[in-house]
Amino acid sequence: MRVIHILDHSIPLQSGYAFRTQAILKEQRALGWETFHLTGPKQGPTAATEEEVNGWHFYRTPPPGGILDGVPGLSELELMGEIAYRIEQAARRVRPHLLHAHSPVLSAIPVLRAGRRLGIPVVYEVRSLWEDAAAGNGTREGGLRYRLRRGIETWALRRADAISTICEGLRGDIVARGIPAEKVTVVPNAVDVEEFSMGGAPDPGLKKQLGLDGVLVLGFIGSFYAYEGLAVLLRALQQMLAQGERVRVLLVGGGQQDAELKRLASELGIENQVVFAGSIPHGEVQRYYDLIDVLVYPRLSMRLTELVTPAKPLEAMARGRLLVASDIGGHRELIRPGETGTLFKPGDPEALSAAVRALLREPARWPGLKAAARRYVETERSWQASVARYADVYARVTQPHRRA
């Protein structure tokens, strides 16, 4: 089986998107499949149109950089044209059995175009819906731009030969658009259970360096988007400090809310109790998990978060950490309340602080929660089990005479 994966971006860039991609590729290679990899212009300028990264070969698509650059609508058309051209170049060289497009839809549309021209079936993997990702970054839900993006997404979904997606929430939304249920397969986010072993003791040197000795540490590791609700965590911290708790918050990562969160910490008078560790190499992340007593995932309730499951809680569960998370659809699909974690009312700092305090009052439950969380990812959320689901999808679309 020869597959070209068409991606928004990849390593060496670090993101949840890139890490999921690498996990998929690693497991597909273990199944004996030949994988080839092409990124769109969002990868940014590269030294060459083909490059090796950590032993993986990538076809790159240079950014257009023409007169249409930055012109709404026209720049997207130019971008998709460049991707389609590169796909056809790579496909004629590789002669794949199928093309596997990974969202956003700006990657899927040129793949559909190239697939039809070359007679190659297309699998479209939806990791998030274009209109909802935009709404999470400032586009008004239900507005004209939102509805246009939704229409384009649905158009692409109808034309793919098969669809994979990362969670049941997204699958339900796709089927509600009139896409046949049998066409949509969930290949859920997972975790490398060998890489993320059951947690160890905190590194005393790192703990001291960050000023976390002798305190309870609440933490978050990930990207600082507005929908992550990290302001709720800071307000909950203020409440806990006012009640005499010896507690700190450790935020690891960065993003568009970085400056706003630092401003809020200062405004609340808790800047000395919040540690902004910044972005860290992926290889260091387990050391930071081990510093945190309770992982907190305070995502706000909106369409994006109700539909889409995050990946980071799975890392915490694999590491055997305690976690509390907001009671939204994406978290409910991952966390079994009282068994593998604790849920609280989204957007409510008081509910968050109450959930943490309740957890701290019952230390006898901690070993059971940690063990159940680890067992869940081992049995249901390993990459080996997840990626095996592609076998049936690929077999269906590559069988002869699949089109009427």
Where are these regions (language model features)?
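Nucleotide-activated donor-binding/catalytic signature segment of Leloir-type glycosyltransferases, i.e.
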Residues: 259-284
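Conserved acidic donor-binding segment of nucleotide-sugar-dependent glycosyltransferases
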Residues: 337-338, 342-349, 358-364
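N-terminal subdomain of nucleotide-sugar transferases
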Residues: 1-62, 402
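A short, well-ordered alpha-helix in the C-terminal region of glycosyltransferases
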Residues: 351, 358, 365-380, 389-392
